[in-house]
């Protein structure tokens, strides 16, 4: 076999392996993060309906704020830059802590329960990016592939938030 054919076989084999890797990891991240994103959507919907039925919950908004501040202090995440951290992690080697996902999930649900103003979309991006980054670290991906996993996580959570995890 001549060298050109060997090179083409090697190159195509590497492309095939890379394609299979991303098919597996996109399905894995979609299932995990899409499920969490759907749960987030369900919780937001449930607490919003609950608040609409019990308008007196609005008076407990300061209590909800105290609980959220306590959670941030407990998890030592007082300098959280939110969605900016997730977006900057895509363009740099900055890591998104996994603790961001449950913290944002819980604090956003609490905020919506008591009638606070918090966007679901930014929260979904933070949750998905945090979990995607953690999956990238778990499987020891290089920096470029970690960035791809962060973006996969963000898109999985974002689409699940709108009730469209499967297209």
Q: Each predicted region: which residue ranges?
A:
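Alpha-helical transmembrane segments and immediately membrane-proximal extracytoplasmic
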Residues: 1-167
